[in-house]
Amino acid sequence: MPRCTLRFEKALHRDGAERIAGIDEAGRGPLAGPVVAAAVILPPRFSLPGLTDSKLLSAQVREEFYLELTTDEKIEFGVGIASVDEIDRLNILRASYLAMERAVSSLRAAPGHLLIDGLPVPVFSFPQTAIVRGDMRSLSIAAASVIAKVTRDRMMLSWHEEFPVYQFCDNKGYGTPEHLASLRTHGPCPLHRRSFAPVAQTYFPFA
């Protein structure tokens, strides 16, 4: 497993870059709920042992890291959300880009360079570096992945109270067998992405 460090951030600093922001998103794959992105600028000597891709962490550890990341005054972060309606209207890729744009726009000031997990994001005019498996290699991206994931999970937990038959508290909108069974029985709710095939193939009691 790659080590998650500040080596990318430090290399950019040596080249003169300032305000280096890691960006990641959560929620591209689920059948329900928004897509959420986060942008994070870490201080130069930042350390948080164990921080890595949010998908590799337990829910409890994610929450602990989220609290540390969002209460440290030396850490700057922004969150952006694209709604279910925007996902259905734009498609999930463009909605993900929109969430990332909103996350960057909510930083206190514009970043000087972006570190992005996976592939380049064409909507940004800022200099950017795309890093394969970046959420396991760059601490800035890993921090963004945790903030985005916990933010989205908390939203899905709150919506479980309104739509308990879909068990969003457990599946967070992903297409588990139980979730698919609930879709077949009850049809989609307003949180479901109607442009996604498993949802589009069911009836719409809320239409």
Pin down the residues of each PLM region.
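RNase H-like, Mg2+-dependent phosphodiesterase core
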Residues: 1-207
